[in-house]
From Swiss-Prot:
Similarity field: Belongs to the TatA/E family.
Function in brief: Part of the twin-arginine translocation (Tat) system that transports large folded proteins containing a characteristic twin-arginine motif in their signal peptide across membranes. TatA could form the protein-conducting channel of the Tat system.
GO molecular function annotations of the record: protein transmembrane transporter activity
Biased composition (Polar residues): 53-75
One GO biological process term: protein transport by the Tat complex
Protein name stated in the entry: Sec-independent protein translocase protein TatA
Transmembrane segments: 1-21
Keywords, in A-Z order: Cell membrane, Membrane, Protein transport, Translocation, Transmembrane, Transmembrane helix, Transport
Membrane topology recorded in Swiss-Prot or TrEMBL: Single-pass membrane protein
Protein backbone atom coordinates (compact mmCIF):
# COMPACT_ATOMS: atom_id res chain seq x y z
CA UNK A 1 0.00 0.00 0.00
CA UNK A 2 2.96 2.33 0.66
CA UNK A 3 4.68 1.98 -2.73
CA UNK A 4 3.48 3.36 -6.03
CA UNK A 5 3.03 1.09 -9.01
CA UNK A 6 4.25 2.05 -12.51
CA UNK A 7 0.69 3.04 -13.42
CA UNK A 8 0.60 5.54 -10.58
CA UNK A 9 3.87 7.09 -11.79
CA UNK A 10 2.57 7.28 -15.38
CA UNK A 11 -0.63 9.02 -14.28
CA UNK A 12 1.37 11.39 -12.11
CA UNK A 13 3.66 12.25 -15.06
CA UNK A 14 0.66 12.96 -17.31
CA UNK A 15 -0.88 15.24 -14.68
CA UNK A 16 2.40 17.16 -14.27
CA UNK A 17 2.72 17.60 -18.04
CA UNK A 18 -0.87 18.82 -18.29
CA UNK A 19 -0.46 21.25 -15.40
CA UNK A 20 2.87 22.79 -16.34
CA UNK A 21 2.94 22.25 -20.08
CA UNK A 22 5.63 20.51 -22.11
CA UNK A 23 7.42 23.80 -22.90
CA UNK A 24 7.85 24.90 -19.29
CA UNK A 25 9.18 21.59 -17.94
CA UNK A 26 12.73 21.89 -19.40
CA UNK A 27 13.03 25.44 -18.05
CA UNK A 28 11.85 24.30 -14.64
CA UNK A 29 14.35 21.41 -14.63
CA UNK A 30 17.16 23.76 -15.69
CA UNK A 31 16.25 26.22 -12.95
CA UNK A 32 16.13 23.43 -10.38
CA UNK A 33 19.57 22.19 -11.46
CA UNK A 34 21.04 25.69 -11.21
CA UNK A 35 19.56 26.13 -7.73
CA UNK A 36 21.00 22.80 -6.60
CA UNK A 37 24.48 23.77 -7.90
CA UNK A 38 24.35 27.08 -6.02
CA UNK A 39 23.19 25.32 -2.86
CA UNK A 40 26.01 22.76 -3.06
CA UNK A 41 28.64 25.44 -3.65
CA UNK A 42 27.38 27.41 -0.64
CA UNK A 43 27.55 24.27 1.51
CA UNK A 44 31.14 23.61 0.42
CA UNK A 45 32.07 27.22 1.16
CA UNK A 46 30.52 27.04 4.63
CA UNK A 47 32.35 23.78 5.37
CA UNK A 48 35.70 25.24 4.30
CA UNK A 49 35.09 28.34 6.46
CA UNK A 50 34.23 26.09 9.38
CA UNK A 51 37.48 24.14 8.94
CA UNK A 52 39.57 27.32 8.87
CA UNK A 53 37.81 28.67 11.98
CA UNK A 54 38.39 25.36 13.78
CA UNK A 55 42.10 25.37 12.93
CA UNK A 56 42.38 29.02 14.03
CA UNK A 57 40.70 28.19 17.34
CA UNK A 58 43.07 25.25 17.83
CA UNK A 59 46.11 27.48 17.30
CA UNK A 60 44.63 30.08 19.61
CA UNK A 61 44.02 27.54 22.39
CA UNK A 62 47.60 26.27 22.06
CA UNK A 63 48.98 29.78 22.51
CA UNK A 64 46.72 30.45 25.51
CA UNK A 65 47.84 27.16 27.10
CA UNK A 66 51.45 28.32 26.85
CA UNK A 67 50.70 31.65 28.59
CA UNK A 68 48.00 31.10 31.22
CA UNK A 69 46.46 34.22 32.71
CA UNK A 70 45.79 34.22 36.46
CA UNK A 71 42.22 34.63 37.60
CA UNK A 72 41.31 36.30 40.87
CA UNK A 73 38.35 34.78 42.66
CA UNK A 74 35.88 36.64 44.83
CA UNK A 75 33.48 35.28 47.39
CA UNK A 76 29.84 36.16 46.87
CA UNK A 77 27.50 35.79 49.82
CA UNK A 78 23.86 34.92 49.11
CA UNK A 79 21.36 37.63 50.04
CA UNK A 80 19.66 37.30 53.41
CA UNK A 81 16.00 36.24 53.24
CA UNK A 82 13.66 39.13 53.88
CA UNK A 83 10.31 38.94 55.63
CA UNK A 84 8.77 41.71 53.52
CA UNK A 85 8.91 40.08 50.10
CA UNK A 86 7.37 36.74 51.01
CA UNK A 87 4.13 36.27 52.85
CA UNK A 88 2.11 33.13 53.23
CA UNK A 89 -0.95 32.95 51.07
CA UNK A 90 -4.14 32.46 53.04
CA UNK A 91 -7.36 31.28 51.43
CA UNK A 92 -10.20 33.77 51.43
CA UNK A 93 -13.03 32.95 53.86
Amino acid sequence: MGSLSPWHWAILAVVVILLFGAKKLPDAARSLGKSMRIFKSELREMQSENKTETSALGAQSESSAANPTPVQSQRVDPPAPSEQGHSEARPAS
